[in-house]
Amino acid sequence: MISADGAIALGLDFGSDSVRVLAVDCQHGTEIDTEVVYYPRWKKGLYCQAAQNQFRHHPLDYIEAMEQAIRQMVKRLSEEQRQHIVGIGVDSTGSTPAPIDEQGQVLALRPDFADNPNAMFVLWKDHTAIEEAEEINRLCRSGEFADYSRYIGGVYSSEWFWAKILHVTRADVAVREAAVSWIELCDWVPALLSGTTAPQDIQRGRCSAGHKSLWHPSWGGLPPRAFLAALDTSLVNDLDYPMFTDTYTAERPVGQITAEWAERLGLPTTVILSGGAFDCHMGAVGAGAQPYTLVKVIGTSTCDILIADDQRVGDRAIAGICGQVEGSVLPGWIGMEAGQSAFGDMYAWFSNLLSWPLHQAALTQPEWQPQLKQIESNLLASLTRAWAQNPSLDHLPVVLDWFNGRRTPNANQRLKGVITDLNLGTDAPTLFGGFIAATAFGARAIMECFEQQDIPIDNVLALGGIARKSPVIMQVCADVMNRPLQIVASDQCCALGAAIFAAVAAGAHDDVPTAQRHMACNIERTLIPDPVQVVRYQQLYQRYQQWCHTAEPHYAPVTKVIH
């Protein structure tokens, strides 16, 4: 053990657009400093085709942004503070895997694959593997094998590990022949910084393996060779089998930072790397979540985390969610994951739609660009204010929040967004109100998915930029869910959670609950449901559910007729 007094832990949060580094005092939880750097290639739209649901991240985006963020922040610390940095924790989006070669190098870092999107990290929201996910689901339900989707909600998603591997393996012969394994981003960064990227040395995180890779101790780890071979023999002939057997909870040390990376980042060579996990799971820890608290990590999408005890769950498999994994959030507790595939992304889509004339005007009148950009940047805030001033629910359009498919309940990435009940009196603020209600309805559907299976929800926490900056949207969520909604007092809970795990791995605290008591953030405010609005939203929610049942069959896969 080392003393927590004066010790500093760093949390690295790899998001969809940027990486954030946060320095935290291990004794008092003070957030000392932070830095955010955007991914340069991603910002230019490289390697992505939104119309085909292809979203890829070049590994150099992660490396360059991480190096810049840490160096810039560390420069602002005193020499004494720099020497007291004891650990680094890492969280990331997920499932965001990439292919690696025999040396553990991500293929896109090699000259022969430098511009090949299939050799890069396949971002969580990449849905190019819908058909492959359906293959996995059919095989799980075929009766030929045990149902290996049992503990991930019964539906394997196109956003997850094996579906993405299967899609890329079939689409790209060169990648298939060069790759010996695949690695999640949250596992790769600690391995990179500690020099343990060789496939046999990688410490696979319990969180990513259990929620996305069909890993479970009841069948000895990953599904058997025969199951993967039945999907495609390349999964066992071209890739290492088993890809891994053991998994580790995130408070376990991965290793010590290498001398090269210590110098590049301006850090002591004694820094310890803790295990990686997904952003929302670490965000729940940073928010101080306790058992049976539903933690909503709200951003472009949402990830919802619930911690339950093994005795309550027993051997039950909770249907319709994104997995139940012992140790994926807190060691010794079952972490359950759910989420909405689009939340902030829906608002951004609506903003972009309305901004089209502004973009055209900027092209023809370049001198107007500063004013037009200002109008566009204020658009969502203006819409929110306009609707809040006249929040009529009498003619509110019903919107289905499937603009990026549906993650929970019951993952189905074929689904598309639906807007109904428009009339000639529907204006932009009213339609935006329908979007706000839709995201709240999606949140309630997740809550009910747990409760209907005897998993109680005693408390609801919301964290992230939208949660803190948009009380109007959060109040609608409280009214729709008919629950007090606690807003967490930090925009950086995911990075804070990563720092908490780093503090434990480095020995500044004995265990995660102790570290939480010292370092987790506080509640900023609590929103109470409005009884009148609760009743009115209940009626709209029933209509939302009716439209869900009506619309979903229209997105079933079309049977191909062979002539």
Curated annotation (Swiss-Prot):
One of its GO terms (molecular function) is ATP binding. The keyword Nucleotide-binding applies. Keywords: Arabinose catabolism, ATP-binding, Carbohydrate metabolism, Kinase, Nucleotide-binding, Transferase. It is an enzyme of class 2 (transferase). Its EC number is 2.7.1.16. One of its GO terms (cellular component) is cytoplasm. It comes from the Bacteria. This is Ribulokinase. It catalyses: D-ribulose + ATP = D-ribulose 5-phosphate + ADP + H(+); L-ribulose + ATP = L-ribulose 5-phosphate + ADP + H(+).
